[in-house]
């Protein structure tokens, strides 16, 4: 059957039993706050508050009176060395000094340098003087047989014999006598070249050669041993009072309060949740967390192994062209020329005059830049610069980890007792209990305060004794006891883990200079600095002793002395000769501080500092009940830096940093020692004339000057108004020297005066301008002949003229007369005569003509541009800025109460002795003697003794009481300042006075001669207003006002010596910076 669908809804069933209790509901919201409780009892008195901030400065008081001059102070110690001034501008280069004498030879270097290459051949020397005649050579071997001589002339015809028969031809006749010498034949051809002559004598030693170039830089010495550490510096003075501390951290949580009353019943909770379901499947992995902060930097790694050598550098630029090579060897001898006809040598001509020196050749092109010289040694360590100023305050660092637990401080003093609390309200009257039984006798109670007298009550009946009462309720809690003494310090806790490095603290104040640390190792060599400006010309060195003779050079060929050729192009630098190390020069003055390098990168945070000293003990608080341990609070702010620890040992040298960029100029170093005076600079251009200054005060009269040249006539001034006749003034001080009058007639010649004292030397005049170039000087006298040079090689055989024929041979003996026959035919030609002796050597031929100079070599390539020159000298300091404006005057302070009367002054010096008193009354008559009879017995000498005694008496009196009538003791002295000692005792009370020998006046100068400046004081002429005028107080405490005559511009002057001495001066207003007020006191002169 089809489904009929759900049936009708049944009746509601009965209520089931209650289900099991649900889970506890979530906590309800907090209840509303309860009503405020009653006011608690007043707490104990709080700790003493911090001192208030200092009050504003008070008003400026009046200027006090000037105190008496103190005794002269002891001379102060030498002041600290001043800071060096700015570098002066470099002076213009001085004139070239004359060449200094050669210095002494330096000590031999550790190693001899390599032998330099042979230098180019020197210029040919001049011809030496004629050498002495050498010894005669050994006799040569006999010459070969000469050729047959010419036939002699026919003999003289003999006397005619008697004619005989013609005989046969007779024998040859005897040899005829030698004929007379024939005419000299033409000169023969030159003979063959002779062999070399004998070795000449050893020549004298040549002059000592010049000193060689300095040797190469010696090898750097080993580092010295480490120096002892310096003594500790003195303990620094205590630092200034610290600033007020920051607010302390929040106190610990208080003890748990008492439990509150039970709250009202809450509303029923919402329906509980069911039991927890089973754990779900594992979820997918979450996103990767953020990267943690980087850990602290690790320790520095060990140095890496050295890298492999780099690739070879690029080929350097081509070196400069070498100097011309020496001349080649002479070419092979050419073919023999045709013999010329030999002329006779002419006589030797006189020497020509020396030619004028040629004009200076044009400057050659600049040579190529030489290679850089060897690096110099490291300079001496410069003086430590002054500490830099404090840096700007850094940003607040992150909070540091808490430091280690400090040791417990000493017990603080007991806190002040708290004020007594207010009295509590009286309680309600309790119900009377039944009378108790008699208790045991209690201890006597403390005496109560006496109550007011009550009225006398009626006597009651005696009550029955009551039973003991029950124990009463505990009384109310007493007031908190006073603070207990601080308990003993706990044991120090275990050392906590190292906290994270704290942030950078504020920069501490600059500490005192510590002792010098040990010298650090040599840093790596810096880049070469820029070339410094040329130094001043050094002083001439002492002449050095002659160096040892150099080795003999290879023997050159003797050339004739040629005229100097044109200067060739500069040769290339030769190799450096040996340079023995000279003695170490003194350290130069420290150079100007180099610019400071840039700030390096921030270093790693250092390890935590040592534990600071324990702080001062805080005031003891009231002991609270021990609370539960609260959760750890967040880290408090970093405490202030502890005091600076002792200086640690120097750490090992760090590796060299990279070369920093050029930093800003460092602070000026300490003043170096004075350099040697530089050469005189050229006169500067005159400056523009400054503005006219304010009129100065009249100066003291100067010493009498030399007679001035007469001035021109001044312009005629306008006539002034006639003033009323004033009273006759006291004698005025001597006026300034008037203009010289017209020249008077020639006076008589005075006596010859004593020679005056030497005047001080005048200041050196300005250096003159450089003179024009002088004419070339005439050629100097012939120098002394040089020492004979070594013997040259043997010259070629000279070609002498042919010697004259030798003398005729001796006549042969006359032969016997032949038989008188017919004359025979001529005999055959006789043999050639013996050769004559060798002729003397002919004169030397003239030197050949000077060859033409060779063509100029090609110009060298233009050198590369030189390095940038050093920075120019520091510019002059800018002008001083104008003075700032004056501040407004403060309000007038109230007048102070009059001071107590001062102590009596010191006893003044003894006054001058008074003039002699009038003669006294005549004394009583003495007993007389009649000496008339004795006069003839008195010797004449007695009268002389009396006269001498009397004159001595008057001189003594004049010494003791001088009357001031002495004339000039030293008329030859000149006017000027002298010291006078009035009582001729010790020199402490001597006076410095000006003696004017022309006016015969002695002038005492005021001390001090001038007083305050930059004050404004005037008397208004228009209104007669005297409020701002000067008040002067005299020695009798009388104030002198307004008794001056106005000169000009508010200045006043008085000429009344009765006002002296002046003890005080009271200007009433101070003017601006460009105004002056002062008081100049002129000298007081006595005649």
UniProtKB/Swiss-Prot annotation:
Family to which this protein belongs: Belongs to the fibrillar collagen family.
PANTHER family: COLLAGEN ALPHA-1(XXIII) CHAIN-LIKE ISOFORM X2 (PTHR37456:SF6), SI:CH211-266K2.1 (PTHR37456)
Compositionally skewed regions (Low complexity) per UniProt: 83-120, 150-159, 166-187, 201-211, 228-241, 278-321, 335-345, 360-384, 396-408, 443-453, 560-602, 613-640, 677-695, 718-740, 776-788, 813-828, 849-868, 897-909
UniProt subcellular location: Secreted, Extracellular space, Extracellular matrix
Biased composition, class Gly residues, residue ranges: 218-227, 409-418, 466-493, 708-717, 792-812
Disordered: annotated segments: 1-931
Sequence ranges assigned to domain Fibrillar collagen NC1 in this UniProt record: 929-1087
InterPro entries to which the protein is assigned, alphabetical: Collagen, Collagen_Structural_Proteins, Fib_collagen_C
Compositional bias annotation for Basic and acidic residues: 504-515, 829-843
One of the record's GO cellular component terms: extracellular region
GO molecular function: extracellular matrix structural constituent
Record keywords, A-Z: Collagen, Disulfide bond, Extracellular matrix, Secreted
Entry protein name: Collagen alpha-2(I) chain
Coiled-coil region: none
Major localisation: secreted
Compositionally biased region (Pro residues): 189-199, 910-924
């Amino acid at each position: 059957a089809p489904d009929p669908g759900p049936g009708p809804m049944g009746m509601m069933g009965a209520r089931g039993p209650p289900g099991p209790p649900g889970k506890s509901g979530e906590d309800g919201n907090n209840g509303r706050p309860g009503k405020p409780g009653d006011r608690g009892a007043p707490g104990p008195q709080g700790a003493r508050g911090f001192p208030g901030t200092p009050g504003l400065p008070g008003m400026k008081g009046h200027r006090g009176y000037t105190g008496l001059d103190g005794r002269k102070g002891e001379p102060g110690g030498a002041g600290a060395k001043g800071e060096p001034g700015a570098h002066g501008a470099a002076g213009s280069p001085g004139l070239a000094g004359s060449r200094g004498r050669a210095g002494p030879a330096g000590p031999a270097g550790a190693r001899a340098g390599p032998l330099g290459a042979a230098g180019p051949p020197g210029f040919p020397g001049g011809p030496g003087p004629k050498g002495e005649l050498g010894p005669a050579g050994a006799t040569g071997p006999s010459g070969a047989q000469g050729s047959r001589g010419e036939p002699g002339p026919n003999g003289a015809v003999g006397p005619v014999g008697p004619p005989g028969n013609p005989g046969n031809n007779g024998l040859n006749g005897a040899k005829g006598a030698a004929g007379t010498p024939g005419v000299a034949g033409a000169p023969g051809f030159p003979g063959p070249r002779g062999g070399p002559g004998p070795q000449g004598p050893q020549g004298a030693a040549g002059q000592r050669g010049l000193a060689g170039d300095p040797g190469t830089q010696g090898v750097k010495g080993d580092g010295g041993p480490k120096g002892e550490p310096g003594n500790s510096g003195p303990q620094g003075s205590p630092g200034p009072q610290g600033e007020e501390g920051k607010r302390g951290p929040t106190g610990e949580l208080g003890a748990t309060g008492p439990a509150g009353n039970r709250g009202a019943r809450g509303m029923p909770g919402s329906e509980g949740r069911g039991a927890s379901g089973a754990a779900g499947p594992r979820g997918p992995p979450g996103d990767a967390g953020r990267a943690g902060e980087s850990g602290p930097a690790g320790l520095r790694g060990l140095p890496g192994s050295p890298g492999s050598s780099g690739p070879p550098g690029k080929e350097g630029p081509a070196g400069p062209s070498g100097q011309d090579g020496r001349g080649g060897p002479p070419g092979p001898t050419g073919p023999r020329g045709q013999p010329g006809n030999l002329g006779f040598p002419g006589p030797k001509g006189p020497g020509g005059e020396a030619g004028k020196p040629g004009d200076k050749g044009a400057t050659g092109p600049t040579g190529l830049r030489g290679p850089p010289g060897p690096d110099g040694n490291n300079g001496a360590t410069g003086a430590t610069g002054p500490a830099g100023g404090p840096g700007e305050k850094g940003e607040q660092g992150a909070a540091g980890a808490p430091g280690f637990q400090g040791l417990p401080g000493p017990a603080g003093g007991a806190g002040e007792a708290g004020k007594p609390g207010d009295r509590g309200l009286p309680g309600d009257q309790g119900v009377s209990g039944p009378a108790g039984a008699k208790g045991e006798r209690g201890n006597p109670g403390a005496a109560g305060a006496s109550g007011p007298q009550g009225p006398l009550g009626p006597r009651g009946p005696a009550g029955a004794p009551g039973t003991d009462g029950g124990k009463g309720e505990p009384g109310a809690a007493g007031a908190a006891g006073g603070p207990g003494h601080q308990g003993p310090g706990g044991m120090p806790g275990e050392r906590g883990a190292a906290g994270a490095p704290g942030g950078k603290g504020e920069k501490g104040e600059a500490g005192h200079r510590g002792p010098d640390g040990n010298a650090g190792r040599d840093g790596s060599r810096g880049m070469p600095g820029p070339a410094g400006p040329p130094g001043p010309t050094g002083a001439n060195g002492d002449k050095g002793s002659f160096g040892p003779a150099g080795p003999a050079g290879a023997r050159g060929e003797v050339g004739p002395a040629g005229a100097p050729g044109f200067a060739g192009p500069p040769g290339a630098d030769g190799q450096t000769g040996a340079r023995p190390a000279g003695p170490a020069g003194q350290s130069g003055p420290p150079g100007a501080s180099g610019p400071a390098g840039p700030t390096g990168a921030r270093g790693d945070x250092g390890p935590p500092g040592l534990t600071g000293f324990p702080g001062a003990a805080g005031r003891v608080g009231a002991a609270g009940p021990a609370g539960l341990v609260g959760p750890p609070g967040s880290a408090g702010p970093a405490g202030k830096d502890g005091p600076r620890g002792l200086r640690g040992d120097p750490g090992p040298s760090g590796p060299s940093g990279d070369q920093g960029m050029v930093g800003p100029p460092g602070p000026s170093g300490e003043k170096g020692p004075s350099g040697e005076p530089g050469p005189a600079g050229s006169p500067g251009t005159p400056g523009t004339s400054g503005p006219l200054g304010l009129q100065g005060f009249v100066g003291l009269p100067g010493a009498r000057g030399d007679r001035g040249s007469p001035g021109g006539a001044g312009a005629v001034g306008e006539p002034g108004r006639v003033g009323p006749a004033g009273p006759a003034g006291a004698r005025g001080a001597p006026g300034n020297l008037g203009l010289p009058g017209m020249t008077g007639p020639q006076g008589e010649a005075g006596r010859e005066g004593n020679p005056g004292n030497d005047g001080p030397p005048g200041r050196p005049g300005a250096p003159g301008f450089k003179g024009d170039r002088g004419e070339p000087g005439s050629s100097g006298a012939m120098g002394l002949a040089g020492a004979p040079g070594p013997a040259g090689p043997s010259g070629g055989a000279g070609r002498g003229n042919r010697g004259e024929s030798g003398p005729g041979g001796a006549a042969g003996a006359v032969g016997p007369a032949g038989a008188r026959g017919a004359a025979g035919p001529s005999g055959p030609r006789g043999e050639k005569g013996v050769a004559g002796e060798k002729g003397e050597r002919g004169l030397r031929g003239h030197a050949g003509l000077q060859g033409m100079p060779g063509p100029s070599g090609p110009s060298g390539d233009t050198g590369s541009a030189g390095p940038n020159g050093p920075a120019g000298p520091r510019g002059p300091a800018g002008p001083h800025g104008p003075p700032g404006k004056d501040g407004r005057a403060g309000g007038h302070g109230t007048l102070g109460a009059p001071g107590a009367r001062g102590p009596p002054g010191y006893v003044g010096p003894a006054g001058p002795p008074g003039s002699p008193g009038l003669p006294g009354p005549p004394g009583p008559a003495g007993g007389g003697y009649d000496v008339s009879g004795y006069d003839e017995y008195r010797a004449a000498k007695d009268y002389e003794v009396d006269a001498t005694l009397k004159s001595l008496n008057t001189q003594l009196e004049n010494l003791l009481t001088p009357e001031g009538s002495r004339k000039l003791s030293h008329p030859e002295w000149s006017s000027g300042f002298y010291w006078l000692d009035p009582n001729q005792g010790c020199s402490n009370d001597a006076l410095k006075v000006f003696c004017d020998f022309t006016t015969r006046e002695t002038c005492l100068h005021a001390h001090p001669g001038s007083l305050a400046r930059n004050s404004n004081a005037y008397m208004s002429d228009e209104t007669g207003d005297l409020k701002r005028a000067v008040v002067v107080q005299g020695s009798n405490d009388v104030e002198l006002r307004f008794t001056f005559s106005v000169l000009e511009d508010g200045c006043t002057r008085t000429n009344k010596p009765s006002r002296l001495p002046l003890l005080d001066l009271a200007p009433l207003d101070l003017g601006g910076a460009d105004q002056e007020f002062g008081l100049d006191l002129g000298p007081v002169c006595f005649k």
